[in-house]
Amino acid sequence: MNHAPHLYFAWQQLVEKSQLMLRLATEEQWDELIASEMAYVNAVQEIAHLTEEIDPSTTMQEQLRPMLRLILDNESKVKQLLQIRMDELAKLVGQSSVQKSVLSAYGDQGGFVLAPQDNLF
């Protein structure tokens, strides 16, 4: 049985999934991006399985090469966008930790509320 057309179609589907993931990352739709990751991983596994079953001809490898380049470029861009997001989250966590420390240090004043008074004299 000739699996070459099925392999080519699987690569096309992987390109589509890769482009979807890049769009989701660009639009900062992080939950949707994470949800789409499993379909992407499954598509990669299917390609690996099909590639083991057949030995793609040199011609087919040449046809698949541009798709592989596009997928790798998209993956690189998604990783860059994810790194930016992780840096943003790390900054927010750091700010939250500082705020918690300040509240802990100054918020527990033995039940007294420390506030400036208008009329001291």
Curated annotation (Swiss-Prot):
Ranges for region Required for homodimerization: 1-50
GO BP terms, alphabetized: bacterial-type flagellum organization; negative regulation of bacterial-type flagellum assembly; protein folding
Family annotation (InterPro entries): FliT
Gene3D superfamilies assigned: Flagellar protein flit (1.20.58.380)
Keyword set includes Transcription: yes
Subcellular location: Cytoplasm, Cytosol
Keyword annotations of the record: Bacterial flagellum biogenesis, Chaperone, Cytoplasm, Repressor, Transcription, Transcription regulation
GO CC terms: cytosol
Region described as FliD binding: spans on this chain: 60-98
Function (record text): Dual-function protein that regulates the transcription of class 2 flagellar operons and that also acts as an export chaperone for the filament-capping protein FliD. As a transcriptional regulator, acts as an anti-FlhDC factor; it directly binds FlhC, thus inhibiting the binding of the FlhC/FlhD complex to class 2 promoters, resulting in decreased expression of class 2 flagellar operons. As a chaperone, effects FliD transition to the membrane by preventing its premature polymerization, and by directing it to the export apparatus.
Binding partners and assembly: Homodimer. Interacts with FliD and FlhC.
Similarity remark: Belongs to the FliT family.
Name of protein: Flagellar protein FliT
Gene that encodes it: fliT
